[in-house]
A protein has these predicted regions:
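Thiol-based oxidoreductase modules, predominantly thioredoxin-like and allied folds used
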Residues: 6, 25-39
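Residues that form or immediately flank small-molecule/cofactor binding pockets and catalytic motifs
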Residues: 9, 34, 74
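Non-catalytic, surface beta->alpha helical segment in thiol-disulfide oxidoreductase systems
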Residues: 56-78
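Structural micro-motif
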Residues: 45-57
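Local sequence-structure signature of Cys/Sec-based thiol-disulfide redox active-site neighborhoods
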Residues: 1-26
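Generic alpha-helix structural propensity
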Residues: 36, 49, 67-70
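Short amphipathic alpha-helix with an adjacent loop that forms part of the alpha/beta core around
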Residues: 38-46, 77-78
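Short phosphate-engaging motifs
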Residues: 12, 37, 61
Length: 78
């Protein structure tokens, strides 16, 4: 499952959600200011510089984590 870190009024975020819907990819949305703060996001994904931030849920030794994929451009390549 993918996780889309989004923010309000973000056309690229909306495009990422639409792309997932069109491809039939299961995804969850986390919204800035509701589900997380910018500081929390930068702590978890320090290399991310723009929205949306796309992550995939993975399990390592039974622990569920989110692995950074990239942004909309990288999502289009998946």
């Amino acid at each position: 499952m993918l996780v889309i870190y989004s923010k309000d009024n973000c056309q690229q975020c909306d495009s990422a959600k639409l792309l997932c819907q069109m491809k039939g990819v299961e995804y969850a949305v986390k919204t800035l200011g509701i589900d997380y703060t910018r500081e929390q996001l930068m702590h978890v994904f320090p290399k991310a510089r723009s929205f949306p931030i796309i992550a995939v849920k993975v399990k390592y030794d039974g622990v569920e984590m989110e692995e950074y994929i990239g942004g909309l451009t990288e999502l289009k390549e998946v």
